[in-house]
């Protein structure tokens, strides 16, 4: 059996934009992924509301994805694949990051995984970087964040090309809910699960 770790934020945790609570278990994308992969894979969901790639949140503690990643990898090792799906929270104005800075922060996570020795027999796990979809309809007060979210695709592509890692850009694959503009509804989680399944099978064939 192979093991994949899904490392992300509230969209991996399963935030429900309709209710403001958590999606039913069967509607979260890592659970959908587990069901699609069948008995071949163990799927570990490591999603946290508000998690960033590598920035300290001035309001909430423990949201920096870079500081928790290595302990997380070691907790769940050996891992065949790590899926990193972060970047949505990093475009918030309080972090003052450009799209290129967000991509570089995710690149830092890529390097942590590659030097972690948490794959089979002390190797590095395979990697899949997921670029969040652009924000959909948002309140005007988030217009700058929405604009920055539309720039992530190109920035992530450049970073993944430089680091030679697999990229899944969700722009055109899954859409954020119009209710809040940046969380996935049930249709969105289904689309993410399908796309990640396809890439996992390609990565591990």
Residue ranges with predicted function:
Residues 11-12, 49, 89, 133:
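Catalytic metal-binding/acid-base residues of hydrolase active sites
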Residues 1-48, 54-59, 72-74, 82, ...:
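Serine-esterase "nucleophile elbow" of acetyl-processing enzymes
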Residues 45-50, 170-174:
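Acidic carboxylate-rich catalytic motifs and surrounding loops in phosphoryl-/glycosyl-chemistry enzymes
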């Amino acid at each position: 059996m192979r093991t994949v770790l899904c490392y992300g934020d509230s969209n991996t945790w399963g935030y429900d934009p309709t209710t403001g609570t958590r999606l039913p278990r069967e509607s979260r994308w890592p659970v959908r992924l587990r069901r699609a992969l069948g008995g071949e894979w163990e799927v570990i969901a490591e999603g946290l509301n508000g998690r960033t790639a590598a920035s300290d949140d001035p309001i909430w503690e423990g949201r920096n994805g870079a500081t928790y990643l290595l302990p997380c990898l070691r907790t769940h090792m050996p891992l065949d694949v790590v899926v990193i799906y972060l970047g949505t929270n990093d475009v918030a104005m309080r972090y003052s990051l450009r799209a290129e800075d967000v991509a570089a922060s995710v690149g830092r996570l890529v390097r942590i995984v590659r030097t972690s020795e948490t794959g089979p027999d002390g190797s590095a796990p395979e990697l899949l970087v997921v670029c969040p979809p652009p924000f959909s309809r948002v309140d005007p007060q988030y217009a700058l964040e929405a604009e920055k979210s539309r720039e992530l695709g190109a920035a992530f592509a450049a970073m993944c090309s430089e680091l030679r890692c697999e990229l899944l850009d969700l722009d055109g694959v899954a859409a954020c809910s119009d209710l809040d503009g940046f969380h996935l509804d049930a249709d969105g989680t289904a689309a993410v699960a399908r796309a990640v399944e396809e890439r996992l099978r390609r990565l591990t064939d």
